From Swiss-Prot:
This is Putative thymidylate synthase. It comes from the Archaea. Belongs to the thymidylate synthase family. Archaeal-type ThyA subfamily. Keywords: Cytoplasm, Methyltransferase, Nucleotide biosynthesis, Transferase. One of its GO terms (molecular function) is thymidylate synthase activity. Gene3D superfamilies: Thymidylate synthase/dCMP hydroxymethylase domain (3.30.572.10).
Length: 217
């Protein structure tokens, strides 16, 4: 593990599980320990970009605390916009009913149906009039969909990314969302790229991560 500050890595991973293991390894070995604004101690690596070539096989890492039932419910809420557990917000609500006005996923589908080479098929979660005044704000900020080489590819930006606890669920849900959009547009789902501005592991997950990354290159 290093204490010096380092910023920026690009990783090409085969699957979601591969992406998780390699991301954890980078944060564990090259991240810097800081105390965040809530007083939590984290090990953080900034600007971590991971390209997942096949996010549809080996979606659930063996070591994650998320089981398939919970992951399916997470994906369902992401795609449908439902909030059955009365959270302050869900990503699905922000994507399907942004500020009570816009279904951004419908917009993405229509945009790509009308113009397959569009660079405007984007959905955002941040609502400035709301999120500048509350404590609970989205970590996932932007989903960008592009059709290239006969497939829809998704690039997702996270301002803050809990790699130890949330990455497997985030990517499981995003892979299901990409499959949904691809089906509606009538093309094949492609790669998923995550850009994590603050990729971090909370101190309560350090021991777990230590065991997971043994043997990871």
């Amino acid at each position: 593990m290093e204490d010096r500050f380092e910023i920026g890595r690009i990783v090409r991973a085969k699957t979601i599980s591969d992406a998780w293991y390699r991301g954890l390894n980078i944060i564990r070995n090259h991240g810097q320990v800081i105390t965040d604004e809530r007083g939590s101690q984290i090990r953080e690596f900034m600007d971590l970009m991971i390209i997942i070539e096949d996010p549809y096989t080996d979606r659930i890492p063996h070591e994650t605390a998320w089981n398939e039932e919970r992951l399916e419910e997470y994906a369902k809420q992401l795609i449908s916009g439902e909030n059955t557990q009365d959270f302050e917000y869900t990503y699905g609500q922000r994507l399907r009913n942004w500020h009570g006005k816009v279904d951004q996923i419908d917009y993405v589908i229509e945009k790509l149906q009308q113009n397959p080479t569009s660079r405007r098929a984007i959905a955002v979660t941040w609502i400035p009039p709301v999120d500048t005044k509350v404590n609970e704000v989205p970590c996932m900020m932007l989903d960008d969909f592009k059709i290239r080489d006969g497939k829809i590819h998704l690039t997702t930006l996270f301002r803050s990314h809990d790699f130890g606890g949330a990455y497997p669920a985030n990517l499981y849900g995003l892979s299901k969302l990409l499959e949904y959009v691809a089906d509606k547009v009538g093309t094949k789902p492609g790669t998923i790229t995550t850009i994590s501005i603050s990729a971090h592991i909370y101190d309560h997950d350090w021991d777990m991560v230590e065991n997971i990354v043994k043997g990871v290159n």
